[in-house]
Amino acid sequence: MKLTATFFSSLFFITVSFTQAQEATKTAKTEERNPDKFKQMYDLFATPNMYRTASGAPGPEYYQQQADYKIDIELDDKNQKLYGTETITYTNNAKESLDYLWVQLDQNEKARNSNSPLVESNKIDPVFSGQSFSRKYLEEDFDGGFKIEYVKDSQGKVMKYTVNQTMMRIELPEVLKFGEKISFSIKWWYNINNYTIDGGRSGYEHFEKDGNNLYVIAQFYPRMAVYNDVEGWQNMQFWGSGEFALPFGNFEVNITVPADHILEATGTLLNRSEVFTPEQLKRYKLAEQSFDKPVIVVTQAEAEAREKGFSTAKKTWKFKAENVRDFGISTSRKFIYDAMAVKTGNTTAMAISLYPKEGNPLWEEYSTRIVAHTLKSYSSFTFDYPYPKAISINARDQGMEYPMICWNFGRPDENGKYTDQTKYGMLGVICHEIGHNYFPMIVNSDERQWTWMDEGLNSFLEYLAEISFDPNFPTRKGPAKNIIPYMSGDQKGLEPIMTNSESIRQFGNNAYGKPATALNILRETIMGHELFDYAFKTYANRWKFKHPTPEDFFRTMEDASAVDLDWFWRGWFYTTDYNDIGIKEVNKYFVSNEPSKEVADFLKKRRRRDSKQGPMVYMIAEGSEDFKPEMNKPFKIFDYKVLDDFVNQNFSEEEKNKLNEPKFFYQVTFNKPGGLVMPIIVEITFEDGTTENHYFPAQIWRMNDQEVNRTFATKKAIAKIQVDPKLETADIDTTNNSWPKTIEKSKFD
């Protein structure tokens, strides 16, 4: 019967009623209720519409533009220049007409007249190397911006354009209506920067010993800006931090380089037999059938022989890529090349690595294996990897991603020795950058606006991939305890996750670490694996090859799980609040036939209003003036006549056998010095060493977000109560997490 479930909890009725009445007069002064903690997100979310629905899915009128490219480029290795021509075919799928187009010229961030250096605060450094002093104060600034030679329409007629730093507006001869296409051509060139000196996501690395260069080429062509239902034209300038917003399209790219170079790029290589030797071609075909280990396609001996040649002949590598948002290239004489096949669900792709001999033995041993593992792991949480390959390029000090290709740091010393830190650093960056194929290359969010939408989600999946690759992987992003130093820092130096990319001061913690931690807490602590994984996979599949916004993610996670997470998004993503939940006090109570003096007075008043009040059971607090030492002796709950009579009158023998018989009663007051509302996770340790765990959802704070009480009726005496015993909620102060209070050892002890 229903009474079974509620009977013993009613033991606290009188005490609780009395306490509430006693404190009624001071509630207004002590209770700090902030209803905004659980307020629904209508005030912050965009209104759902026919483009983006309230469920977080694309709406029936959702659209996105298409930009197709035919590109021919040539690399001048002697002078480090790149020359190119392209034809862009742009399709307007918006149900509105366009008067002009915006094209991104991100390379202009390195132009001599770039405004990017002018928006950074700087001071005089106390010490310089000769090279750094010369570059800062003596030499003319490097000019790495685009040199646009022409913009022409499909008939060869010059089109009018205006360049504003990293954006170029092309004026159309007539409006581009819904469903119409326009083709136009651009010719350009630029100086390739030495990124090891100038920094940046693209450029070349020079090897003094053999005189060769290793190129990682990106942002190398004028690229269409995004036009959508949220921003209109996303033509925010590229200042260097906020990365890219790009439409999907199809690419045909011909790349001419010295004949002795080995090259890889986005897309399918169409003329492999023309650029590989017969032996290399044979090895590559073996790699296509090797699912358990990489096959060396271009050997170290072949790479070392090419390093000495400096051929003046040329070769053109021809690529085709479908439904990608961008294109990246890497080329060098120095490259060793290995590959293996990897199956993800119903698709098979090639995992590929290119690296100079300076990367061995580390790269030959690990790179392609971690590429393959990453594809399998990420696909299990999202969708089968849809592209034909994923490439890891070894480039000094790099960590950058493009569709199907990425550049990654990590090399042993000159003697081929490396530490665990070097090894795991390399494995981590490869996993992370390969993972970007999913976010944002396929789930194509606006990086220029919201860095966390790709970096945060990717860092979360990276964490899952790393610990499945090696359970002892020293992963940095994901575990809740790792974000505590950031979240507990000076609030004046923090911004909410929902902050534009160019306004974030602690970029790594804000856009990578904190959102990754938030998602890990959702999965491990708040939603559970089953609900979280289904919702996350729903988001990935809804927005695969589309352009999601933050609201689309937030709404989908709730829509697919039936878990109200508005309180979580508001606290973790829209504020810099931190979590700090502690135990304020613990009071032990004992069953008594006699009320305390205060309760007796309370009951007299109550009985004046309720003459039918029958015999009662009373709870006496240990330490109160009514407490008697004999109350602490062993007893049976049914020794008390009121309880024994009640049970005999209301329960069958079968039901009585199922009743609990608690001997100890505790009231625990939890307080919350931190601003975040979070679940209360409690571990109780009994005097016999056994433990019991309790989980109270975050909604426990909805009526009072400063203090809440929970009661525990136990058969055994409690020796210790611990909040967040596994450190899974990013609680910044664990000194208030224990009862009895424990003194945490200093790192100096």
Please name every model-derived segment.
Residues E32-T53, A67, F319, A351-N648:
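Hydrophobic alpha-helical and helix-loop surface patches within well-folded domains
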Residues E86-I88, N92, L105-Q107, E180-N194, ...:
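Short, hydrophobic/aromatic-enriched beta-strand segments in well-ordered soluble domains
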Residues P222-W233, W239-C431, F460:
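Hydrophobic helix-coil surface modules that form long, contiguous segments used
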Residues N113-F128, W189-F251, R272, L727-D749:
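Glycine/proline-rich low-complexity spacer/linker segments in large multi-domain proteins
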Residues T27-Q104:
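Early extracytoplasmic/domain-onset interaction patches
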Residues W102-G156, D260-H261, T685-F696, A713:
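Solvent-exposed beta-hairpin/edge-strand motifs
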Residues E264-A265, L565-D566, I581-W701, D705-R710, ...:
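Beta-strand-rich binding/interaction modules
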Residues A24-E32, D72, K81, T91, ...:
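A surface-exposed beta-strand-loop module
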